[in-house]
A protein has these predicted regions:
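Compositionally biased terminal segments of proteins
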Residues: 1-170
Length: 170
């Protein structure tokens, strides 16, 4: 994808910095083709594209492709996240989530087909992901931007808004 240099506004910088640091820590050779999704991409869109949005959520969602196609990378992400101060818990829908400082982290994977399959165990990472339809739209059309010492991937705005239009009636 295209690379941009991200200069976030002072108001969003601290929160977005936490999210980007978490992404970098989790993405080190483990979450192949993972990207930040959900409302946390909006401050990035605002800085890069001038799209205005008032961030009101502390949910941090990462879309993941479940494994590198040539080798299963084993890593205890549950341990990694909890070592960063997050507490893991199982939501009412059975999805594993992590919480700290008002943030709630969740992993989302593409769900092919139309039926609900519950949570998706990802044994090689010691966690589970919530399978949702049409996540592949977000993962297939993404942008990478520089942030501080690292970079972060997120859906291209066109893909993000198309995804919202498709899932809104559901």
């Amino acid at each position: 994808g295209a690379f941009h240099h991200l200069q976030v506004s002072e108001i969003a910088a601290v929160r977005l910095s936490h999210v980007c640091q978490l992404y970098e820590r989790l993405n080190v050779g483990v979450l192949y083709e993972s990207l930040l999704i959900g409302s946390w991409v909006m401050p990035i869109y605002q800085e890069l594209y001038g799209i205005r949005y008032v961030l009101r959520t502390f949910d941090i969602d990462f879309a993941v492709s479940l494994a590198h196609p040539r080798k299963k990378l084993r890593r205890d992400l549950e341990h990694l996240i909890t070592s960063l101060g997050f507490i893991d818990f199982i939501g009412t829908d059975g999805t594993q989530k992590f919480t700290a400082g008002g943030y709630e982290v969740e992993f989302i994977a593409h769900r092919p087909g139309g039926r609900d399959i519950g949570t998706l165990p990802v044994g090689e990472w010691n966690l589970n992901a919530m399978p949702l339809p049409f996540i592949n739209i977000l993962t297939d059309f993404s942008v990478t931007t520089d942030f501080g010492q690292g970079s972060i991937r997120f859906p291209a705005p066109e893909a993000y808004f198309l995804h919202k239009l498709i899932i809104a009636p559901r």
